[in-house]
Amino acid sequence: MKKQRNLRSMAAQAVEQVVEQGQSLSNILPPLQQKVSDKDKALLQELCFGVLRTLSQLDWLINKLMARPMTGKQRTVHYLIMVGLYQLLYTRIPPHAALAETVEGAIAIKRPQLKGLINGVLRQFQRRQEELLAEFNTRDARYLHPSWLLKRLQKAYPEQWQSIAEANNQRPPMWLRINRTHHSRDSWLALLDEAGMKGFPHADYPDAVRLETPAPVHALPGFEDGWVTVQDASAQGCMTWLAPQNGEHILDLCAAPGGKTTHILEVAPEAQVVAVDIDEQRLSRIYDNLKRLGMKATVKQGDGRYPSQWCGEQQFDRILLDAPCSATGVIRRHPDIKWLRRDRDIPELAQLQSEILDAIWPHLKSGGTLVYATCSVLPEENSLQIKAFLQRTADAELCETGTPEQPGKQNQPGAEEGDGFFYAKLIKK
C-alpha cells in the first residue's frame, strides 16, 4: 500500500519546477504519479494541469490578496496557495476540504509556521471572490496567456484570436487512431460499444475516433495488441497529405515518439521507413510503439540539419518533416507550454526549421513529396516559413495545400476538435 501523501504540496512543487526552473510537466509528473494511489493520480494531474492552465489568473489573485509576494525558500508557498485557489474556483472539491488539505500541505513542504497565512489568504478570497473576479474579468489576463503570445495571436488572427485563446484553455478530447491493418474503423467502434464506451468518427480523417469520455488506454479494446493508438486527429491528418505507398522509401524526420512512423506503416505496411530524431532518449518511445504494433522500421539518432551524417547520399520517395516548433497549437494538452516558451524562441525556432528544410530537400527524389508539419499556430513557423522556402528553392512546388501567397493548411485548436496544426505538401519538380 502506497504511503498517503499530500497531493496539494506535490502539485505546488511540480508547478514551481515548471515556472521557476523551466522544466517540462511531462517529465515531472509521471514520477510523482508513481508515488500515489491510482485514485489520486487523476487528481494530482488535474491540480498540476489546472494551475498551469489558469496561472496568470491565480498569480493576479495572489497579488491582490497578499501585501507582498513570497520569495526565496518560501516561494513554494506561493504555488501552494495557487493550488488552493484553483480548487476553490474550478473543482467540485468541497471548500472546507480544499482549505484543510492545502493548509496541511504546509507541513509537507516544511513550512508549518505558515499554515495560518495560507488559511487566511484562502478565506479572504472566499469573502472577496465576487469582487475580485469582476475586476479580473476586465483585464487581458483573463485570456490566461502570457502577453507576448496574446499579442502574436492578435496580430496573426485579428478575427480569431479570442476563440484560439479560449480553445487553448479547454480540456482536450481524447482522439484515437484505429489500426486499419487489424480492423476497419466501424468494426472497432462496435468493439468499443461492447466495452460500454462510445466513440465518434472524424469526418475527414479515416482512422480517427473521438472518445465521448477519455478512458485509460488499458480499457481500450486491443490496445496492447496494437489495434488502436492514442493520437490527436490533426496529427493523423499528416497521412492525408503524405499518402505513403507500399514499396517506397520514406523518411520520418523528427519522428519521436513514433506516432506518425507507425501511422505510415499502417497505411503502407510494405514501405521502407527510416525514423530519425535528435533526442536519443526519446528514440526508446519509437521502439516501444513499433513493438506494441508489431512493426519494423529503421530508427536512427540524428540532427535534421546534417542528414549526410546519418543517411549519406540516400534519397527518399517521401519525407515527413514534423518540424521542431513552439507547440502553440497543443497548449490545451500541455498548458506548461504557455509558461515555458518565450517570445525570443519564435525567431530561433523559425531559423532552425529553415535550416532543416534546406538540408533535407536534396535527399528527396525528383517527383517526390515532402510534407512539412508543425503543431504551431504562428505564421512565422508555418505559412511564412513555407513561402520563404518556395521563393528560394527553384525545384519546390506547393501541392494541394493553400496558394503560393498563403501556402499551407492551418488547423486551429478546437476546429473539428483537433489540435492546432499546420501542413504544407511540397513536390520536387
Swiss-Prot record:
Belongs to the class I-like SAM-binding methyltransferase superfamily. RsmB/NOP family. Keywords: Cytoplasm, Methyltransferase, RNA-binding, rRNA processing, S-adenosyl-L-methionine, Transferase. This is Ribosomal RNA small subunit methyltransferase B. Its main location: cytoplasm. It is found in: Cytoplasm. It catalyses: cytidine(967) in 16S rRNA + S-adenosyl-L-methionine = 5-methylcytidine(967) in 16S rRNA + S-adenosyl-L-homocysteine + H(+). One of its GO terms (biological process) is regulation of DNA-templated transcription. Specifically methylates the cytosine at position 967 (m5C967) of 16S rRNA. One of its GO terms (cellular component) is cytosol. The active site is at 375 (nucleophile). Disulfide bonds: none annotated. S-adenosyl-L-methionine binds at residues 254-260, 277, 303, 322. It comes from Shigella flexneri. CDD domains: AdoMet_MTases, Methyltransferase_Sun. One of its GO terms (molecular function) is RNA binding. Its EC number is 2.1.1.176. The keyword Transferase applies.
